[in-house]
Curated annotation (Swiss-Prot):
Description of how the protein assembles with itself and partners: Probably interacts with PlsX.
Gene Ontology terms: cellular component: plasma membrane
An MF annotation (GO) of this entry: acyl-phosphate glycerol-3-phosphate acyltransferase activity
NCBIfam families: glycerol-3-phosphate 1-O-acyltransferase PlsY (TIGR00023)
Pfam families, alphabetized: G3P_acyltransf
Protein name in the entry: Glycerol-3-phosphate acyltransferase
UniProt KW Transmembrane keyword: yes
Pathway note: Lipid metabolism; phospholipid metabolism
Lineage: Bacteria, Bacillati, Bacillota, Bacilli, Bacillales
Similarity annotation: Belongs to the PlsY family.
The protein's Enzyme Commission number: 2.3.1.275
Length: 206
């Protein structure tokens, strides 16, 4: 029991590492919480600091979920890797190192799935990148991939007859969509920011 609690705490602390805040302060001298949406996540980093900083934060946030999920495997723990990954997701959303105000945990959730369900991760990655390429909106890409992921997760659960990952992913995906409710409103109004992810420069980055 002590080992399980320790792994969960470690996962939470890993998730609490605010890469967006660190990259903003160390690399650009700004507090990203005071710019854009104010979220400590990949989307706001791309929007405010550009794609180089955004990619760094994306890798960091993705890595948090992946590393946290790997810990139970490396320690041969009885704890399912999914729960360690979920602890990192909670840490990202409510980070102890950033006054409990973080991001929406899309990338961190992706890192968790990379370890716990690689097939589902691949489905999400393809849907995310395809939507991003077409819309240049990270928020819309997150919403679309979460929605497609729910269908994929249920399908995987039916095929494999293992509902642990599909069940918790579905709950997490619905939460991610809920966290994007303000983005959904802006998308409908045509005012949602776009990024220059696939552009050669930052001139079209909001």
């Amino acid at each position: 029991m002590i080992e399980i609690i320790g792994i969960l705490i470690l996962g939470y602390l890993l998730g609490s590492i605010p890469f967006a805040l660190l990259v903003g302060k160390w690399g650009h001298g700004i507090d990203i919480r005071q710019h854009g949406s104010g979220n400590l996540g990949t989307t706001n980093t791309f929007r405010v600091l550009g794609k180089k900083a955004g990619i760094i934060v994306l890798i960091g946030d993705l890595g948090k979920g992946a590393v946290a999920s790997l810990v139970p495997i490396l320690l041969a723990s009885e704890l399912h890797p999914l729960f360690a990954g979920l602890a990192a997701v909670v840490g990202h959303i409510y980070p102890v190192f950033a006054r409990f105000k973080g991001g929406k945990a899309v990338a961190t959730s992706g890192g968790m799935l990379l370890v716990t369900s690689p097939i589902l991760f691949l489905v999400l990655l393809i849907s995310f990148l395809t939507t991003l390429r077409l819309s240049r909106m990270v928020s819309l890409s997150s919403i679309v991939s979460a929605s497609i992921g729910i269908v994929a997760a249920i399908t995987i659960g039916i095929v494999e007859q293992d509902w642990i990952v599909p069940t918790f992913f579905t709950i997490l995906a619905l939460f991610v969509i809920f966290k994007h409710r303000e983005n959904i409103s802006r998308i409908r109004q045509g005012t949602e920011s776009k990024i220059g992810m696939f552009a050669k420069d930052k001139k079209d980055t909001d």
